[in-house]
Regions:
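N-terminal leader/targeting and accessory segments in enzymes
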Residues: 1-67
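Phosphate-binding loop of NTP-binding sites
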Residues: 63-171
Length: 171
């Protein structure tokens, strides 16, 4: 996802995400030079034809990332706490982690990774040794939760509060 954080190039898969402010496709050549062999793209460049790499061309790279991580989540039959609300998600997540980690091997969202990109990056970190997941989900537009909820697939839900934060996306 972030070309600056490529540690294991030969074991990495790069999703060339696009947004209003950026286009991940412009980093593909740089990553090829670093040894990355697997890419999910929505814009294929013919110059990549002779590269020793795999390219999966999809309509929407964010949707592909979310789908892949949703399938990854299905591999784990453990309790998962999903936390949402206008405010307080991160502090509630951190409190729960502090209370539960002495008793369970927990995985949690790093920092405030609660967006359509942050949630998949968090859930992707689930491993067989984990006994409990604690993830936060933030929404700022109508129907956004329908993309995030299947990725977290919580067995326990916590709704912190409903306030005016992010309300501009719901008008």
């Amino acid at each position: 996802i972030d070309s600056r954080n490529c540690i294991y190039a030969d074991k990495s898969i790069f999703f060339a995400l696009t947004s209003k402010t950026g286009n991940g496709h412009k980093y593909v050549d740089e990553l090829l030079g670093q040894g990355v062999k697997n890419f999910v793209v929505s814009q294929y460049n013919e110059a990549w034809n002779n590269q020793d790499a795999n390219f999966w061309v999809v309509e929407n790279t964010l949707s592909a990332l979310q789908f892949l991580v949703g399938e990854h989540r299905k591999r784990f039959d453990i309790p998962v706490i999903g936390i949402t609300g206008s405010n307080g998600k991160t502090i509630v997540k951190e409190w729960l982690y502090a209370l539960l980690q002495p008793y369970y091997r927990c995985i949690r969202s790093p920092k405030s990774f609660n967006s359509q990109i942050g949630v998949p990056l968090s859930v992707w970190q689930m491993r067989p040794e984990h006994q409990l997941g604690i993830f936060e989900a933030g929404i700022s537009t109508i129907l956004e939760m329908q993309h995030i909820a299947p990725i977290i697939s919580p067995t326990i839900g916590i709704f912190t509060n409903l306030g005016t934060a992010h309300q501009e996306g719901f008008e």
